[in-house]
């Protein structure tokens, strides 16, 4: 099975797309064969959309099985989500995909987000929300990937951060990279509990680590 791909001819697929258990959001003009691969491998429905007029859909949105968070000013895109609950992050610090790290049970977010923003995330995604960092990085959304089966994060995650992540999500913390050593591995990985797709530069050992961490090894 093919598990590596480019979107817009680049391997940083997590910047341009994001997925949940049910859907994958991709920018318009994503190649049909790429959409077909994502649909088949991840077992999801493809939605083509801009977010705030931008093609960096993965950097600007974050969702789970309960809904999607979009940035301040993105109400024009809400009409594309007719069957998906959508919330708008009220803060100006709002590259949602970069600053929210979430699955169906919890979310870790940028430590500078306001209480109002945390309330909006909790209400839309229906999860408990916590402020924190991964490897000292505030943009937690790209510093790892979490699904309903596993957790993979930046290699420089600290012991105290590991403890917090394990408590929040209930999984052991695994470390890894994508795209031949990229430590902000969320930029090169789309995953749900059914499967994953990584950027085209991701190596065999990196793919093996992803499989192990996210629960795809028999």
Curated annotation (Swiss-Prot):
It holds the Pfam family eIF-6. Keywords: Initiation factor, Protein biosynthesis. InterPro entries: eIF6 (IPR002769). GO terms for cellular component: cytosol. SMART domains: eIF6. Binds to the 50S ribosomal subunit and prevents its association with the 30S ribosomal subunit to form the 70S initiation complex. Belongs to the eIF-6 family. This is Translation initiation factor 6. It comes from Methanosarcina acetivorans (strain ATCC 35395 / DSM 2834 / JCM 12185 / C2A).
